A protein has these predicted regions:
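N-terminal presequence-like segments and the immediate start of the first folded domain
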Residues: 1-265, 270-288
């Protein structure tokens, strides 16, 4: 569950959510993420993933704070973590390191690790000022945990790293989805279309991951942009060109995973400015 809004709207949204959810609120807060005011005003959007099942998910806590849920269905079990962050350290890289350690601790608590994770979402305030540092931290952990490196099977989760910071003031936060049961059920796509493996230019994530979710086989497509094979931005200064290239890159991933536009269940677009948002809306409305 995620809420995207201007900082000034966060408390209003928190209160509204509490009133609407009532006894459905199990104490696990959504990821409140700070975005600039866009065409829709102070509130950019709310994203909720829900599963209809016979029972309520089990609440997971870290250091006494509810931060996720476990869903169990016959033969399957899933862990979702929300808004994992750290504010005990001052430097962004130190916060990222503590954040990754917290997520790993939660996974270990239930007999899993990052090899069980098909998808992560990384929320990074002022991303351009420290993205290289973040990548070094993440890569270090993934090597330590055996996701990448000699003898590994390149098991990097699909991921989004976006320049939206958590509303609690931390430099970063993360969400993740893990498959606790069945084990070793995730496939990873490293290279597709015009995009080579992101790890070649220092970003440790897969282009997509396929795994078993409650409703069946699911493909998670990573955050995708107008990037060439070497990781450089293309169509600089041309919003329409970047948007069309991004859509082309996403479709290449879908095709590689034997999917099409008709198989897409959910998508979210992050636009840097309202000007870009206007261009995106004009292109989106014309998509077949």
């Amino acid at each position: 569950e995620r809420v995207f809004s201007a900082r000034s709207a966060v408390e209003t949204l928190r209160t509204a959510r509490s009133g609407v959810y009532g006894d459905l609120d199990d104490g696990v807060a959504p990821s409140f993420l700070v975005a600039s005011e866009g065409l829709s005003g102070l509130i950019a959007g709310v994203q909720v993933h829900a599963v209809s099942s016979g029972g309520r998910p089990q609440v997971v806590d870290l250091d006494g704070v509810p931060c996720g849920r476990i869903l169990r269905v016959p033969g399957r079990a899933y862990l979702a973590l929300s808004g994992v962050s750290d504010q005990q350290h001052e430097q962004p890289a130190d916060q990222a390191r503590a954040m990754m350690q917290k997520a790993e601790a939660a996974l270990r608590k239930f007999g899993a690790d990052f090899l069980s994770v098909p998808r992560t979402w990384m929320w990074l305030k002022d991303i351009l000022s420290w993205y290289d540092d973040f990548n070094q931290v993440r890569t270090g952990f993934f090597k330590e945990w055996g996701l990448i490196g000699a003898g590994s099977r390149q098991s990097m989760p699909a991921s989004t790293g976006i320049g939206l910071g958590p509303a609690n003031g931390a430099h970063c936060a993360m969400d993740l989805m893990a498959v606790l049961e069945p084990t070793e059920c995730t496939q990873y796509l490293q290279t597709t279309g015009k995009q080579h493996c992101a790890f070649e230019y220092g970003s440790a994530f897969s282009r997509a991951a396929r795994s078993i979710m409650p409703a069946g086989e699911t493909v998670f497509v990573s955050g995708t942009a107008s990037i060439d094979a070497g990781g450089a931005t293309t169509h600089v200064g041309d919003a329409a060109g970047q948007i069309n290239a991004t859509i082309e890159n996403v479709r290449a991933v879908l095709s590689e995973m034997q999917c099409s536009d008709d198989d897409v269940v959910q998508v979210i677009a992050y636009c840097k400015t309202t000007a870009v948002e206007k261009v995106f809306n004009s292109i989106k409305d014309k998509l077949a």
